[in-house]
């Protein structure tokens, strides 16, 4: 967290960064992030992929870590680098050749250090992010559809995802567009 605070000060200046740092520092001892687990059988038909010609999907690459550092947080870039090294499957969404979002999946919950009951054929959909400038354009829906298709092609039977309870946009994508159960 210190690295993230230093980054905020360098990026935004002390005055702009201080309210964020103060809020995080005050809530840090009491932080209890709650997640919900979302499940979806891959035996169900996949959602209709609406043509989003402006969004392309490709594998996440080491060069994409600069985007994560710039748009999100340095600690998230470090986590993404660890995921690449551990063999997670990462994908990136691009508009006009520029990365605007990413998402991860893996077949071993211990790689993500979460306590989920995995069965043979399960795949875990983990972290996903969309740049603020691209939100509301269908980036996460496109990434989620791409992950579902890849999981189905790899003959997985079920996907699991854990999502923060306060992440309404992500929960809406999974409930409404991906037909997942919470």
PLM-predicted stretches and their roles:
Residues 72-132, 145:
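A conserved beta-strand-loop-helix scaffold within acyl/acetyltransferase catalytic domains
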Residues 62, 133, 164-165:
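Short, surface-exposed acidic/glycine-rich loop or hinge patches that mediate macromolecular interfaces
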Residues 151-163:
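Conserved GNAT acetyl-CoA-binding A-motif
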Residues 1-63, 67-71, 76-79:
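Acyl-donor-binding surface of acyltransferase catalytic domains
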Residues 53, 121, 157:
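Residue-level signal for beta-strand positions within conserved beta-sheet cores that form or flank
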Residues 127-130, 136-153, 172, 176:
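Conserved acetyl-CoA-binding loop-helix of GNAT-fold acetyltransferases
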Residues 165-182:
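Conserved active-site alpha-helix within GNAT-family acetyltransferase domains
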